[in-house]
Amino acid sequence: VTASAEAINHAGIAARAAAEKLGEDISVLDVTGRMPLADCFVIVTGDNERMVASIVDEIEAELAEKAGVKPRMREGHRDGRWVLLDYGTIICHVQRREEREFYGLDRLYRDCPAVPVEGVEQPDRGSWAEGLDVTELGDIDRLDPLQAQSIEDLPLAGPGPDADEI
């Protein structure tokens, strides 16, 4: 299964809008094989909360103007650390670097193909997805967390908090 032409078009608009506002490490992934509710993820990094908000506003404005669509749902805008825009066929994740590294959507969806977007250079996915070989895990949904000997056995996004942070 591959993403629809409409989803690829909308994802491209979102990715270019994010690039216009200096979003970094912009990834567009075809998640049709893993997500029944969306065709593409657009994952973007912003340096700080203000930049995240600016990127989100630009994505919304460009998709409204060029595709006539508005998000069905918008989550996280108040905090500005990880904003999710759900457009149905695409879901945009605009995150601060710390959230992106910790939650690791790039790792969780490592097996999903990248969708090329003209004018947007996507990051080397290995740098975001290192440490997890999904092909060795098989179906990630079949992993039994109760069988793990330690947290390192689980396909989590990043290191857990230090003892003094708990």
Where are these regions (language model features)?
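Glycine/charge-rich, flexible interdomain linkers and switch-proximal surface loops
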Residues: 25-36, 70-89
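Intrinsically disordered, low-complexity mixed-charge segments
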Residues: 113-146
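N-terminal first-folded block
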Residues: 8-40, 47
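Compact, glycine-rich, soluble single-domain proteins
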Residues: 51-69, 84
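Short hydrophobic/aromatic beta-strand micro-patches
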Residues: 43-46, 95
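N-terminal presequence-like segments and adjacent domain-start helices
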Residues: 1-7
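Short linear motifs in low-complexity or flexible loops
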Residues: 148, 157-163
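C-terminal structural segments of small proteins and small subunits
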Residues: 95-108, 115
